[in-house]
Every structure is written in C-alpha cells, then in structure tokens.
C-alpha cells in the first residue's frame, strides 16, 4: 500500500489525444491459442487452421502401400475437448499440467464391404492456456514465445560475380514442409537447385510439357537477340525429360517412370509434403501479380504435371536480370494486362518476415506426433485382422502425447515464465525470437538480421532487446502492434481524407504501408482535424520529407506506438540515448516487488494497463457492489441488470486472493484488497493489488529524494550511497520465498522414513518439528536447521546363514539408521510459511517411481536493502550500493530534509540519459505539491513547463520561510554568489531573493553537508526520482567455504556457489605470489588448500588440536598427470634427492 490510502491527485501532460486505447497486451498469445483450439465453434464450422488442419492433413489414413491392401481407410470426423480435471491453481499446488482430454470421432471404412465402424478415440491430454496467456506444465508456469522467421514465398536477391550483378530467385515453403528451391544464372544457363542438386530449369519445363519452340520463346521474351546456350535436353518429350530429371535428383535409383512421377509429385506437388502455406501463396501472388490458390509449386492432374507459379518466377527473374522496371503478368478479370513492378527483395523487411505464434507452433508439433501415430496405424492395418479392426484398436496416442511433452518441456520456444514482477510477466508473453527450431542460431546471425529496420516502426520495438549474444535476435512487440491471420505484424494508422485526419483506424502490414505517405502522431492539428501547418513532416518508405496536407494518406495513432510496453514506461524517453534506454527497459523487468509498493510520482500513463493485463492483480469482470472483503476473498453482489457470466453463484461473484505464493523467480506473489464494503465496481476495475501494484498502478520501485553530486568517493564508478532511513522505513524491503523438498524412497536396504525420531540429535535441534518430523509453519529457521526429519537405513554387510537363522528366531534387531534430513542450506533461512506433504495414493498426486512420499517446505525471507545490492532508475542509470549512511550524515536541504540517495554526476553526461534529470526536476515539483504526474512518451512535459512549476513551488516555499522569520543566512548567500560566478544563474549583486527564484528555475538547490553542517560549495540538483531494487541481490551471490566437496578425479575443490565450491587460485594469482617470493604461502595454496589429500587431512587435525600445521605431500593432480603420461606410453618416475625412485602411488593401487 502507499503511505496514504488515498489516491494522490494525478496531473496529466501531453497535447495529443489518442484515438484508440492500447489493445489487450496478451492478445498475441490468447487469440492465437483460441484460433488453434476453435473450441467455441461447432465442428462443421471450424476453419482449416490449427488443430483442425493437423487432423485434416493426417487423415484419411489409407494403408495401400507397395501393392498390398486390406481395403481399410481410417477417416476423421470431428474432435472435442473434455473438461480439465484440475484448475490451474490445483495444478501449481500438485505439480500437475493444466490440460484437457482430447477426443476425436474417427470412422473406419472397409472399402470392399462398405462397412463403417465409428468410434470416439482418446488422443491424449492437450495442455491448455490460462486466461493470462501462459501454460502450467508440471506445476510451473511456462510461456511459449512467438518466433519470427522468413516468410514462405518467392524472393529475388542479387550478388556480384566479378563485376557483373547476378540475380537469384528463391522459392521458400513453410518450415519443414518441403525443399528450398533456388534459380540462378550460371554461364547463361538458368539453373535450378533442389536439395543441393543442380540442373537446367529447361529440363523441368520440358516435364511440364514445354517444347523447343516454347522454351525459345520463353527465354528470348525480354531479349529477342539473345544467344541461347546449347540445350542438352533438346527434342526430349515430357517422359524422357522426367526420367533424366529423376537420374539427376536420385542418381542411385534405377529410372522408372512410375517411380519418377511418384518422386517429383512428393517433392513439389503433394499438398501433404510440399506446402507454401497461405502466407507463402499470398506473398507469391502479391509479388508476381497472380491470383492462384494452390499451395504447391507444381500441380498434377491426369498423369501430367502442371505449373503453379514456377514459369512466372522464371519470367520475373529474367526481367530483373535484363534491368526492366515492369513486367506483364497475365490479365485481370476485364482482360487488362497486369503490369507488375520488378524489384529486388529486402529479406529483413517485415513484409518478408512473419511471426509464428503459439497456435501455429503447437499445430506443427501436433502434426509431427500425428504423423508418427499414422505410421503406427498403417502398420497395424497391415499386420492385424482387418475384420476385427476398430478405430480404438488401431490408434495409439503415445506419439501425440510424447510430441506435446517434448514441445512444452524441451523446445527452445517454451520457456520458464519470468514472474519477477507483473511487467516481466507481460513482457515475456510479448517476446519475439528469431532463434529456435527452424530459426537462426546466435553464431550464424549476422549484423543485418539483428539491426533495426525502418519497417520495425510501430511493429517491433527498436529499443528493447537483450544486451550480449542475443542482441537483435530477441525483440519485443510494439505497444499497439497486432499479428494478423497470416502471421505478419500490423501497425495502426488513422486515415487522412483530403488533408483531414479522421478517427478511422486501419491496421497495415509493412509492405502495404510502403505505398503511403504517413504523418507523425505529433503533427499539429486544428480542432476540425485538418493539419495546422502548410507543410507536414511525413514519411514514405521510412524517408522523412515535407508534404502538402492533401498528399498525406495516413497518420500515426499515438507517439508511443513505436516502442514496446517496457520502453513506454520510461518518462522523458526522448531525452535518453538509445543504449541507456535499452538498459532501462530491460532493468524494469528485473525490479523486485517491494513490501511497500509506491507508484511513480512521474509516470507515463501506461502503468494502469500493465497491471490490468498482466494477470497478477484481481480485476473485476462484473458490475455490482462489494458486500464482503477480507484478506483471502472479495465478494461482489451483482446489480440487478448485470449479465450472469462465468463464476457467478446466485448473484454473488467471489474473487479468491492469492496470499504469499512463490513465483518462478522466488519473489512473493501476494494480493490485497483495495476496495471496501459498499464500493461500486465495474468490469475492468482493479479490486485487489497484486505484487508491485499500488491502487491499480504499476509500482516497481520507490519515489525517493536524490542528489546528483560527488560524495567523498563513495559513489565512484557507479557506486551508490544511500541513507539508512530507507532501510529503517522498509522502503526497499522485499519478501523472497524459497522452496525446498525432500523425497522418502524405497531403497534396496529398506524404506526411508519421514520422522521426528532422528538418532544423535538433541531436543533443541528438534524443537520446531511436529510429531511427523515436519517443521511447523511460523518457525524461524537458520542455515543448518532441520526442515524435515528423515532417516535411511545404513548399508550393512550381508548376514551369514547362521546370523539369518538367529534373526528369524529371535526377531529383527533394531537396524542402524542414519540421519538424511532436509536442512536449510548455507546462506538461506527465514520464516516457514507453508508445508505440503504428498503421499503415494493421494488423489491427483503423481510421484516419481520408487518415491513413497514427498514433503515441500516454503521458507520466506525478508530482505532489506544492503551494501552490494543493485539499484537502478528507469533511464539505465544503475549501480551497486556502496555505503549506507545514517540520515544525519547525508546531505540535507535548507528545511532539514535529508537526501535518501546520492548519484555520481559523472554518470550522466557521457551516457546521455538526460531523461533522469528532467524526471528529477518534475519529481521535485511532485514532492513539494504532493501530487503525481503523467508525462507520456514523446509527448512529455516541456522544460519550460517544469521550470515554471519549480518557480511557483519555490515562491510558495520562500514566502512560508519569510512568514516564519527565517531570513537568508550568510552561507546561503555565498553559495548563490558562487552559482553566479559559475554561470548557473545571473550574479545576484545583492538581490538574493531574485537569485533564489532563479536558482529554483534551474532545479538546483543549496545543499548542506550532514557531517559538518557547512553548505556544499555549489548548487546541487536535488529532486525525487523513481529508483528500483533489482533482482541481483548480494545475498544470493555472496558465498564462503572452509571445507566442502572435492572433484573426484583431481581432488580439487569444486567451483561455484551452487556446488558449495572454493575460490579458484588461478595462473595469474600464482604469478603474483611468485613475484613476491611468498614460497610457503604458494606451496600451501597448491597443496593443502587444494588437492593434497593426506596433507589437508593432517592440516585439519592440527588446526583442530591447536598444533602447528605440518608440511605437505604430493598433490593429487600431479598423480593424475603422471598417470596420463603413463597412458601415452611414457615411463615417468619421481626421484628423490639421492636419485632413488619414489613410489607416489604407494598404498593406492594393487601391486602388479
């Protein structure tokens, strides 16, 4: 909650009114999955996409193969989804997958007898998407991110052979749905490349029925005088050409006509194996000016192959090579010849790249699973008894289930959801990746693919992308962008009619946008919608120019349509350098939700939408009045005329709240109500704040008073100095929840037991365990404390027959057990908030084989801000807390207000992120007036407006000071004089009141050193800035070890915090000790502190007993080296001072 429960007054800047609101920010995911399932449509009305298309492609399954046939055909009628057995919440609790059973109605037709058997077959469980656009797989939230790839279709590109420019055509099908085909000129011959095999394209044209005369006419159409090279296939008929083509493509196989037809059909004409897809055919028709519907490159009818776009591609390529500007491609419905412009293609243009969303990726994966299932069906048809066959007996659903599991569990595009805060959650669903199956790889991707393209405008954010190896390959959807049915990204524009801007909004793909002149969103307009200026700055194909208003076709809908949601949350973005804005965008997603959420004093107006669309807060979906509120539920009674929808029982809708739940990243998901009994609520209203939400506005950090000044070197190199007041007031305190689990298994020695009865432990160690040995909720635990008591049987030698006899007579003696309890790991601890016990046989519990029961313990930790934590603002200014000073030692303002945080001024000019300075000045106005501001991206408050507000606030403050009798003292006058000398203000010349007002306009203040009480020599920028604590906390990174695990072979300590490893003393560190001649220290480092087994044991004993540490022996790694040299056949011996061999392996190995 905020410091006050009342909403502060929010004042909005910005001249531009937005004609359409932001679309639903998760619609890319939700709509795609809906289109994939089509669950709300009747079976006979379903479109041929998604799940339906996967079924339609695989069925009917006919086993007529290699001349054998039993006359069975398995055909598909319809599919339906059952009800999911568990809710998403139950699935998270029990480690289950949120899914629904998929049933298909199949019919088996006996062709001979005409008998039809119909059956409903269970095809496995299909994971379902939750309302917020994610999946719950094995209890964990996952997101399937969209993939961007080269759209199928035809592309014309150029390259230089020597000094001659040569053009190439490439025909690309849908991913994994056929071979890429390339056409290029080689010594005057147009060659075709399929599956790495080249042949003259004339050979394939002869197969399509072209004779010598037609070929000559085709190849000399644009250059009648051209000398055609010798054609080795001259005079061949289609069948001969087909056999010749078959020998080129399949050199090993004997050329037979039927085999050749079957091969070529499968390669380029079979819709099941070669598919341009709807986008591919659309792109091909657009490029070549045709209107074909076939999704293959060749057609096959009556035993003959026909053309479906190949000849047009050849003609276009020849026209391009000849340098023509247009080419005639057929005629339209009225018989008028269609002139198509001849241009090269830019493969990075967003008209040539498309997005594969969840639905398409899932359908592809299902197709793979169904293809495997169909193979199994064919085998069973051939091997089994045809009369006894039924659809249920023929179909095995295992391949489908395996394909789904593999996709969600192992695919590069199915990712563990980033739940650090609501923004990171939302951003993850809007991610677009060029990596993944069928995509690019980091190593292969060049600069061009990663670069910002002009068509990214309004579609893909030019700013938000990771730093490092994935830069430009992973990007984010712009705020208003949508993905259309064909997978192309569209941006919205307002239509301009005769120089007047209308409210009619049109969504356009990048290639359509290229045809128009588009004005910017900030072009000044008159009240009637006409442009206010005679010349309008607008762009065509990305080039800005001045146009007359009547020449403008469209106008941007909003200034923020160019950037993503993360970036649109940065106020004064237009004053920040892009590199720092990128860091600011990315770091907002790493902000940890704080205990006291406080929305920014200077926001951009997008904060509310992030909270409502991310799904982390509770949003009302009904109209009514709140009748009951507590920490776990809110009840809303519907108004009489409100529609009864969804989860309404009677006329009451109950909203369950999530309390202290662990997110994927270990942050705390907690919701608390912000409505009271009697409040009226409407659909879309936030009624309970989730993590990092304050009164329905996103609250990732805190509004704190900052100064930008050097501070005794404590803020050197981006280090940050903070006041202890922030820690005391819990401003940056966050709750983190760790999950620990332990399994009790059935072992060869006997079952493990979860119990309180653990040998060798005092009662004090067991005080927080209940009678079952599980820690009580509310207990405070420290590293080493027991969370769950468990005993396992010790391994013992096999008893002799006599012993076994005695045991059977006198009963089993108490067998030895060892303590294998779950303990708190080093560096962890906190308060136990929840324990869950799963036993085999419980409803809905699915334990691994051999596991009898599992106990899970959640421990919450309250983390205050400490030295070593990373903090950052929204403009990419980041640093590590270097010192926490008492508030009385921090610099303070003239009214005694101490500064909360000190940034280094050297971090601003070279990085050119001046947005933070403007935010600080406007934040200072917010602090003085107690209100909050909204300043939209690219439509922000002007510097002049901020100066005026600072002046008004300062005038009030000075008047108050005067009224209270506090005059300017001598020290303040000195600072003002100095400010005059520095040129910050005009020299005061005795008029200090005017100088104070002037200084206020600059946003600077007179600041005093808290330690000495003396004023700081020059004026300092002081104001309120929004600062976030990031997920990189020192507590997770700090690590120390005395003794611990060692590597098996080298016997050296392991590395890394996760392995409880040691610190590596590397080559350069050894050089440092050598340089100092510290021989004994060096020997210690290389022996007893590392891998001298006997030496380190002896040293440990000596330290425990308080004796002097004895010398070292031979390190283990030296023995490994000697053995490796032995394995090379080198006889290596170790000699002592008297040249006598020393057996370094004594006692280690059996004598030969």
UniProtKB/Swiss-Prot annotation:
Q: What does it catalyze?
A: RNA(n) + a ribonucleoside 5'-triphosphate = RNA(n+1) + diphosphate
Q: Which residues form the signal peptide?
A: none
- BP GO terms, sorted: DNA-templated transcription
UniProt KW Nucleotidyltransferase keyword: yes
Q: Which GO terms describe its cellular component?
A: DNA-directed RNA polymerase complex
Sorted alphabetically, the keyword list is:
DNA-directed RNA polymerase, Nucleotidyltransferase, Transcription, Transferase
Whether Nucleotidyltransferase counts among this entry's keywords is yes
InterPro entries attached here?
A: DNA-dir_RNA_pol_bsu_ext_1_sf, DNA-dir_RNA_pol_bsu_external_1, DNA-dir_RNA_pol_su2, DNA-dir_RNAP_su2_dom, DNA-dir_RNAP_su2_hyb_sf, RNA_pol_bsu_bac, RNA_pol_bsu_CS, RNA_pol_bsu_protrusion
**GO MF entries:** DNA binding; DNA-directed RNA polymerase activity; ribonucleoside binding
Q: What EC number is given for this enzyme?
A: 2.7.7.6
Recorded hits in CDD domains, A to Z, give: RNA_pol_B_RPB2
Its family remark reads: Belongs to the RNA polymerase beta chain family.
Q: What does this protein do?
A: DNA-dependent RNA polymerase catalyzes the transcription of DNA into RNA using the four ribonucleoside triphosphates as substrates.
Q: Which HAMAP family match?
A: RNApol_bact_RpoB (MF_01321)
Assembly, per entry = The RNAP catalytic core consists of 2 alpha, 1 beta, 1 beta' and 1 omega subunit. When a sigma factor is associated with the core the holoenzyme is formed, which can initiate transcription.
Q: Which PANTHER family match?
A: DNA-DIRECTED RNA POLYMERASE I SUBUNIT 2
- The protein's name is DNA-directed RNA polymerase subunit beta
Q: What is the lineage of its organism?
A: Bacteria, Thermotogati, Deinococcota, Deinococci, Deinococcales
Name of the gene this protein is made from: rpoB
């Amino acid at each position: 909650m905020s410091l006050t429960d009342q909403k502060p007054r929010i004042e909005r800047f910005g001249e531009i009114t937005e004609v359409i609101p932001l679309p639903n920010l998760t619609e890319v995911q939700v709509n795609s999955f809906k289109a994939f399932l089509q669950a709300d449509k009747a079976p006979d009305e379903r479109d041929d996409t998604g799940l339906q298309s996967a079924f339609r492609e695989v069925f009917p399954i006919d086993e007529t193969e290699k001349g054998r046939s039993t006359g069975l055909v398995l055909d598909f009628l319809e599919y339906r989804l059952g009800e999911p057995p568990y809710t998403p919440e139950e699935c998270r609790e029990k480690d289950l997958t949120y899914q629904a059973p998929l049933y298909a109605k199949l019919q088996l037709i006996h062709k001979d007898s005409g008998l039809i058997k119909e059956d409903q077959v269970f095809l496995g469980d299909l994971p379902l998407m939750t309302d917020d656009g994610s999946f719950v797989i094995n209890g964990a939230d996952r997101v399937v991110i969209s993939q961007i790839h080269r759209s199928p279709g035809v592309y014309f590109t150029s390259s230089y052979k020597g000094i001659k420019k040569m053009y190439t055509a490439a025909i690309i099908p849908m991913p994994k749905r056929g071979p890429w085909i390339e056409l290029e000129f080689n010594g005057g011959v147009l060659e075709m490349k399929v599956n790495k095999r080249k042949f003259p394209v004339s050979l394939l044209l002869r197969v399509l029925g072209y004779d010598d005369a037609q070929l000559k006419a085709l190849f000399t159409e644009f250059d009648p005088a051209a000398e055609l090279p010798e054609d080795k296939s001259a005079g061949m008929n289609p069948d001969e050409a087909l056999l010749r083509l078959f020998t080129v493509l399949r050199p090993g196989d004997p050329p037979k006509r039927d085999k050749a037809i079957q091969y070529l059909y499968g390669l380029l004409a079979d819709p099941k194996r070669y598919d341009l897809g709807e986008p591919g055919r659309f792109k091909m028709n657009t490029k070549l000016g045709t209107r074909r519907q076939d999704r293959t490159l060749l057609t096959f009818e009556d035993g003959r192959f026909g053309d479906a776009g190949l000849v047009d591609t050849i003609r276009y390529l020849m026209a391009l090579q000849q340098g023509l500007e247009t080419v005639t491609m057929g005629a339209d419905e009225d018989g008028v010849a269609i002139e198509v412009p001849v241009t090269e293609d830019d493969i990075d243009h967003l008209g040539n790249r498309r997005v594969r969303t969840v639905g398409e990726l899932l359908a592809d994966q299902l197709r793979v699973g169904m293809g495997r299932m169909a193979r199994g069906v064919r085998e069973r048809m051939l091997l089994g008894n045809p009369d006894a066959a039924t659809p249920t007996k023929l179909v095995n659903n295992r391949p489908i289930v395996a394909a789904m599991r593999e996709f969600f569990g192992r695919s590069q595009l199915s990712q563990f959801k980033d739940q650090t805060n609501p923004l990171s959650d939302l951003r993850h669903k809007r991610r677009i990746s060029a990596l993944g199956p069928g995509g690019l790889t980091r190593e292969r991707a060049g600069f061009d693919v990663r670069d910002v393209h002009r068509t990214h405008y309004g579609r893909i954010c030019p700013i938000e992308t990771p730093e490092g190896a994935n830069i430009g390959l992973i990007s984010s959807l712009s705020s208003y962008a949508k993905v259309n049915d064909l997978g192309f990204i569209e941006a919205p524009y307002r239509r301009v009619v005769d120089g007047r801007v209308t409210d009619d909004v049109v969504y356009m793909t990048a290639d359509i946008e290229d045809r128009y002149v588009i004005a910017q969103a900030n072009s000044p307009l008159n009240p009637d919608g006409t442009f206010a200026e005679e010349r309008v700055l607008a762009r065509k194909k990305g080039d800005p120019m001045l146009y007359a208003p009547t020449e403008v076709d469209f106008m941007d809908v909003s200034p923020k349509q160019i950037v993503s949601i993360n970036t649109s949350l940065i106020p004064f973005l237009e004053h920040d350098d892009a590199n720092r804005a990128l860091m600011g965008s990315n770091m907002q997603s790493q902000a940890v939700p704080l205990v006291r959420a406080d929305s920014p004093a200077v926001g951009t107006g997008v904060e509310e939408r992030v909270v409502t669309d991310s799904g982390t807060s509770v949003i009302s979906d009904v109209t009514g009045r709140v009748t009951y509120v507590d920490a776990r539920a809110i009840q809303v009674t519907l108004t009489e005329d409100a529609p009864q929808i969804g989860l309404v029982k009677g006329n009451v809708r109950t909203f369950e709240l999530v309390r202290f739940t662990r997110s994927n990243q270990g942050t705390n998901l907690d919701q608390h109500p912000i409505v009271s009994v009697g409040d009226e609520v409407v659909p879309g209203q936030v009624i309970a704040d989730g993590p990092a939400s304050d009164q329905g506005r996103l609250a990732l950090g805190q509004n704190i008073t900052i100064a930008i000044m050097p501070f005794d070197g404590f803020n050197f190199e981006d280090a940050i100095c903070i006041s202890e007041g922030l820690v005391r007031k819990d401003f940056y305190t966050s709750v983190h929840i760790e999950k620990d689990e332990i399994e009790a298994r059935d072992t060869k020695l006997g079952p493990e037991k979860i119990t309180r009865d653990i040998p060798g432990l005092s009662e004090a160690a067991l005080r927080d365990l209940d009678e079952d040995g599980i820690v009580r909720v509310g207990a405070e635990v420290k590293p080493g404390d027991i969370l769950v008591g468990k005993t396992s049987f010790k391994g013992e030698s096999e008893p002799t027959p006599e012993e076994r006899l005695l045991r059977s007579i006198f009963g089993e003696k108490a067998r030895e057990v060892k303590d294998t309890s779950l303990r708190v790991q080093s560096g962890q601890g906190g308060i136990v908030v929840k324990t869950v016990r799963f036993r085999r046989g419980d409803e809905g519990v699915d334990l691994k084989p051999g596991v009898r029961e599992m106990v899970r313990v959640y421990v919450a930790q309250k983390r205050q801000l400490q030295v070593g934590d990373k903090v950052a603002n929204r403009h990419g200014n980041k640093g590590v807390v270097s010192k926490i000073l008492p508030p009385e030692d921090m610099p303070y303002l003239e009214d005694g207000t101490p500064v909360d945080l000190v940034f280094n001024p050297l971090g601003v000019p070279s990085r050119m992120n001046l947005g933070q300075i403007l935010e600080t000045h406007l934040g200072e106005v917010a602090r003085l007036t107690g209100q909050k501001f909204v300043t939209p991206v690219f439509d922000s408050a002007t510097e002049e407006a901020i100066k005026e507000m600072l002046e008004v606030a300062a005038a009030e403050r000075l008047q108050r000071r005067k009224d209270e009798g506090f005059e300017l003292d001598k020290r303040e006058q000195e600072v003002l004089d100095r400010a005059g000398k520095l040129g910050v203000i005009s020299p005061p010349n005795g008029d200090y009141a005017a100088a104070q007002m002037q200084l206020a306009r600059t946003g600077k203040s007179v600041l005093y050193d808290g330690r000495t009480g003396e004023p700081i020599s020059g004026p300092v920028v002081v104001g309120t800035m929004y600062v976030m604590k990031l997920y990189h906390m020192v507590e997770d990174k700090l690590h120390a070890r005395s003794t611990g695990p060692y590597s098996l072979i080298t016997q050296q300590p392991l590395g890394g915090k996760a392995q409880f490893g040691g610190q590596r003393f590397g080559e350069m560190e050894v050089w440092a000790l050598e340089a100092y001649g510290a021989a004994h220290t060096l020997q210690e480092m290389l022996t007893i502190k590392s891998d001298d087994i006997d030496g380190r044991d002896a040293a440990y004993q000596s330290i425990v007993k308080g004796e002097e540490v004895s010398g070292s022996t031979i390190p283990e790694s030296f023995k490994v080296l000697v053995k490796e040299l032995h394995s090379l056949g080198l006889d290596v011996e170790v000699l002592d001072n008297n040249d006598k061999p020393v057996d370094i392996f004594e006692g280690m190995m059996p004598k030969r």
